[in-house]
A protein has these predicted regions:
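A donor-sugar binding/catalytic signature common to diverse glycosyltransferases
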Residues: 88-99, 109, 245-282
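Donor nucleotide-activated moiety binding/catalytic core segment of transferases
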Residues: 73-80, 219, 223-259
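A conserved, positively charged/aromatic
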Residues: 108-110, 118-132, 246
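Catalytic donor nucleotide-activated moiety binding site of glycosyltransferases and closely related
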Residues: 47-60, 102, 188, 205-237
Length: 350
């Protein structure tokens, strides 16, 4: 089978990498298309993948630029799929769905964002896609008949214990020792981030002071510029090692929904300070069913301080959250193995 993947974000690469390797081992042909996005291309190069970059330059954020880039990606995916003689197209972007529809080939959309969060992307994608492979709680609106639900999360495709083992020696090699809190600041510039608030400089300073007063070191992983007062707290590591650092943190304080899910997969307590609170079904399930993460809206900074103090005062916090993680893992599947089986047996498994 000729299987074409399109990747528009580093997290999408992590999601498919273990399945893609297994598909190749099983004798299938795999082609990977990407666009330039953060560390995505570096990850593929370091792992030795062959790929084609169909959008090498960053686009502007104006609506016309977004639509133009989307149209060009669809055209590029269409041409690449024809040359490759793709039997199936897989990815999150609307270009996969639209190209598959034009070629009359199965197009599989993989995501875990609810339709209310990605409304515009859903409008460009769901009418054309063949199936939507998503975690069971993920809402897809009127396209429910296209949904293939699974008991898991996209982050389990690479952070499941079958694929990832945290290594404390990697953390120590950076001179990170003792108890520490990781603060993650996201850029919040994606189309679905419009109007969403997060952690501001003033509040981050207060959180750093609070965790230090409680005997913890503070490290900041940031996609945004830091002020001079916070720059000394910047986490300086190789980007591939972030999950090891996250795994051994006493707490994650973040306005990144993605890293909050990753923390839950690793059993690291997390507080997500974001106006997405209550709007993302995957995170709500992780909070309500497993108590692995806690959401607080941005108009409640005092609540953030209180929850931080509560978690850092727990004497058995690591053991407690690892037990919660084990409960979650016992009820979820190996997502990478599921994706491999889904593709190899398509359309029987759905």
């Amino acid at each position: 089978m000729n299987i074409l993947f399109y990747l528009g974000h580093p997290a999408q690469y992590h999601f498919i990498k273990n399945s893609a390797r297994q598909l190749i081992e099983d004798g299938h042909q795999v082609k990977i298309l990407i666009k330039t996005k953060d560390i995505l291309e570096s990850l593929l190069q370091e792992d030795g993948w062959e790929y084609e970059n169909i959008q090498p330059n960053y686009r502007k954020n104006a609506k016309l630029a977004i639509l133009t880039a989307s149209f060009k990606r669809t055209l590029a995916v269409l041409k690449a799929a024809r040359r490759f003689k793709a039997d199936i197209l897989i990815g999150t972007d609307s270009s996969i769905a639209q190209a598959g529809w034009l070629l009359r080939k199965p197009a599989i959309t993989t995501l875990e964002d609810d339709i209310e969060v990605i409304g515009n992307l859903a409008k460009l994608t769901y009418p054309f896609t063949t199936h939507i492979v998503a975690p069971r709680p993920c809402r897809v609106g009127k396209w429910e008949k296209k949904k293939v639900p699974y008991e898991g999360y996209m982050k389990l495709a690479y952070l499941h214990p079958n694929y990832f083992t945290p290594d404390e020696n990697i953390v120590r090699d950076y001179g990170i020792e003792g108890k520490y809190v990781l603060i993650r600041l996201a850029k919040l510039v994606a189309h679905h981030d419009a109007g969403i608030g997060g952690l501001g400089t003033s509040l981050v300073k207060k959180m750093v002071a609070q965790v230090e007063a409680m005997g913890y070191k503070a490290y900041i992983s940031s996609e945004v510029d830091l002020c001079a007062d916070l720059e000394p707290y910047r986490l300086s590591i190789h980007y591939r090692d972030i999950h090891h650092v996250l795994a051994f943190a006493s707490l994650l304080i973040s306005d990144s929904q993605s890293m909050s899910v990753e923390a839950a997969m690793l059993g690291t307590p997390s507080i997500r300070f974001s106006d997405f609170k209550g709007r993302i079904s995957v995170l709500e399930e992780l909070e309500e069913n497993y108590q692995l993460t806690f959401g607080i809206k941005t108009d409640e900074p005092e609540k953030l301080k209180e929850k931080t103090a509560e978690l850092l005062r727990m004497s058995d916090v690591r053991a407690t959250f690892q037990q919660r993680r084990q409960k979650m893992l016992s009820e979820k599947i190996d997502v990478a193995a599921f994706l491999t089986a889904f593709i190899e047996n398509y359309p029987e498994i759905r």
